[in-house]
Amino acid sequence: MVTTRSSARRTPSAELPLLDGHASGNGHANGNGHANGYTSVNGTSKKRHSNTNGVNGRDDEHDSKRQKVAEPVDRTRWRMKADDGRHTWHYLDDKEAAEKWPQSYADKWYMGLPLNLPALDPPKAPSDAVRNGLTFFEHLQLPTGHWGCEYGGPTFLLPGYAITWYATKQHIPEIYKKEIKNYLFARAHPEDGGWGLHIEGESTVLGTSLNYIALRIMGVEPDHPVMTKARATLHKLGGATHAPHWAKFWMAVLGVCKYDIVNPAPPELWLLPDWVPIHPWRWWVHIRQVFLSMSYITSKRWSCEEDDLIRSLRNEVFVEPWESIDWNGNRNSICEKDNYHPKTWLLSTANWVLATIWNPYLRPNYIKNKAEACVSNLIDMEMANTDFACLAPVNQPMSLVCCYIRDGPDSYTVRRLRERMEDGIFVNADGMMVCGTNGVQSWDTAFAIQAVVSSGLANDPRWRPMMEKALEFLDNQQIREDVKDMDKCYRHPRKGAWAFSTKVQGYAVSDCVSEALKSVILLQKEASGYPQRLDDRRIFDAVDTLLTYQDPKTGGCASYERPRGGQWMEMLNAAEIFGNIMVEYLYPECTTAAVTTLKLFQKHWPDYRAKEVSTFIERAVRWIKTAQYDHGGWYGSWAICFTYATMFGLESLATIGETYENSESARRGCEFLVSKQREDGGWSEHYQSCEEMRYVEHPSGSQVVMTAWALIGLMLAKYPDVERLRRGVAFIAGRQQPDGEWKQEAVEGVFNKSCCIGYPNYKFTFTIKALGMFAQRYPDVKL
C-alpha cells in the first residue's frame, strides 16, 4: 500500500484556517475515519440541473455512470460566510454551533438541498414569470447585498491548491479531503474516468494528471477503481511526459518530475527595459502574474521534500520507468488533446537556447540573483495591493510557494496567503472546488439591478429593499484610490472603478466598471427615491477611469488594460492549452458596456468632459461595426459565444439609435440571431463555438440563458416579428419551476477561447431581464 505524507510534518501553525465549529479543532479524523463529532448522512443529494451538461451535472445517461460520492458528508453542516463580499466556507461539526448559525437559503441552494419554498401562481403573462423569478432569486441574496455563486469549471485550479498545500507541509482538514474527493469523483469523465481542461471537456493529460495527483494527496489509494480507470486513460494519452507546460511545472514543484522537462520561464525578462516589445509588462495581466511567480520558482528549481507518496506517484503517472525518462527530450512532448495552441518555431527556438545554452553555461549568478530579486519585489507589490488575495487562484498558490521558499514556513506572508486562499474555495452539491476568481460579486450584482430596472420594477415597493441592499453593496465595493506606485508594478488606473469581485482584489476591468456604474446611475437617477450613495465626484471618478480604457488606435476596449502589445506576441504563448492570452484584445462585450454606460452618464451629466465622452462613444461604435462577422454576428470571448456577443453588438448600435429598421449592421445582427432560433423557440450554442470560431449548436438543445441573450439583443434592435420573440419568451417561462427557479443547464462562460467557466446566476439575471423587457414592450401579449 502506498503511504501518504505523515501528519508529523504538518505543524499546527500550518493548518488551514477558518473552519469554525470543527469539533476536533485541528481537523484530524477519529478512529472510524470521520471527523470527531461528525454524524454522517447519505450524501447523495437531488441535482439542480436539467438533462444537459452543466455546471452542476451532466445529463441523465452520464449521471448514472458517475461516482456519486467518495465519502458521505452531512451537507446541512456547511455554511458560507460573506464578509464585505469575501466568501469563506465553514463546516460546523458541533450540533449546537450549527443550531446557532442556521443555513441560509443560499447555503442550501449551493448544497443542492431542498429549499421547501411554496409553489407560486402559474404565470399567465411574462410579467408574472418575472415576479416569480425575482421571488426565488431574492432568497439567494446575501446579507451584504450581493449574490454568490460557484464560479467553477476549470479543472487545473484545485490541483494547484492541493499541490501547494502538500508541498508547503500544510495540514489539510479531513472534511476538505472528503469534499475534494467527492468533487473530483463526481467530475471524472463518465466514459474514460479522466478529467479535461474544464468540466465539460474531453479528458486531457493536464486535467487527468493533475487531478489524479490531487486525489492521491487527499489520501485516495492507487488501487481505487476511480484511480485505476483514470490512470489507464492517462497512460493512453501518453502519460505525464505529454502534459502541457503548466502541468509539468506543478509536477516539478511536487518533485514528481524533474525541472529539465519544464520549458524555461526566465525571470530575466523582467530586467529588460520597458520599451522592449516582449517585456512582460505588455502581456495580458493574468499570464503576466502567473509568469511572475512561475519564473521565480523555476529559477530556484525548487521542489518539495521527497517522500513515499511522491516516489509512488513517479511510478504511477508515467508510461515509462521514471529513472529512464529523458526529461530534457520531453520538454516539448504534449498530447494532441492538450495542444490547443502549438508552440511556434520562435518559442521553440527561444526555449532551446535558454534551456541548453543560457541557463547551464552562460547565465551569471549576479543576473540570476538580480532577476529573482526583481520578481520577488513585484510579487510583494501584488500581495500588498490585494491584501494577499492576489489576482486569482491561479497565481495565488504560486505566490505562496514563492514566499515559502523565500521567507520560510512560519513567515507572515505564508500564513496570510494561506488564509487568503480560502477566498477561492467553494462548496457545492458535488463537493469542494476552486473558483476562477475569488467570486463574481460586483459583476452579478450589477446585472441583478439591471434586470429589475429593465422589468420596470425598480420603483415597486416589493423589490426596493432588495435593490437598496444591492446598491449599498456596489457603494461599498467601489475602489476609491489608485494602486500605490502603479507605474512600478505596471497597473492600470482604477480610482472610482469596480473589480469583477471585490474592491480588496482590486483589479478593475472595463466592463465591470461600466456595468456597476450603469447600475448605480439607473437606481440613483432613473428610478425614484433611492439613496444617493455615490455623489457626483465618485461618479466622475468612475467615468475618468472608464475613459482610459479606449484603445487610441481603434476605439475598442479591452478588459483589464489597454492593449500594450501586438497580436504577434502570441508567437510566445507557452501555455499551449489556451489561445489569445499573451496580450489584451478588444472585445465587443467590453466596448458595448462602456458605450452604453457613457451614453447613460451623458444623459444626466451632459457637461462633464462632454467632447471626450462623445468622441469615445462615436469611435467605440465605429469599432463595434468593424468587429461584426460576415454572417452578421459578433464573436464573444467571455461567454458562449456568438449569441452572447451579438446581444452586446446590437445594444451598442441601439445606443446611438441604430435598429433593425434603419441600420444595415443591426439588421444583419438580427437576421443572424433569428436564423439560429430553434423550433421550440429557444437558442442553443455549444462551447465549441469559442474554440472553432463558428456557430455550433449545443447537442442537448435550447438553453434559457442563450435564449435570453438572443431575445435581449433582438428587442434592443426593435426586431419587428413579435411572434418570434413571444416563442422565445414562452420557452424561458416554460422552463421556470413552480417556485420561480430555473435549473442549471449547460455552462455559460468561457475564457481564452478554450476553457469553459460557469456563471450560475445568469439563468436568473438575464432570463428575468429578457422576460421583463418583453413585458414592458408588449404588455398585452400573453404566454
Regions flagged by a language model, labelled:
Residues V2-L783:
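Preference for long, amphipathic alpha-helical scaffolds in soluble/luminal domains
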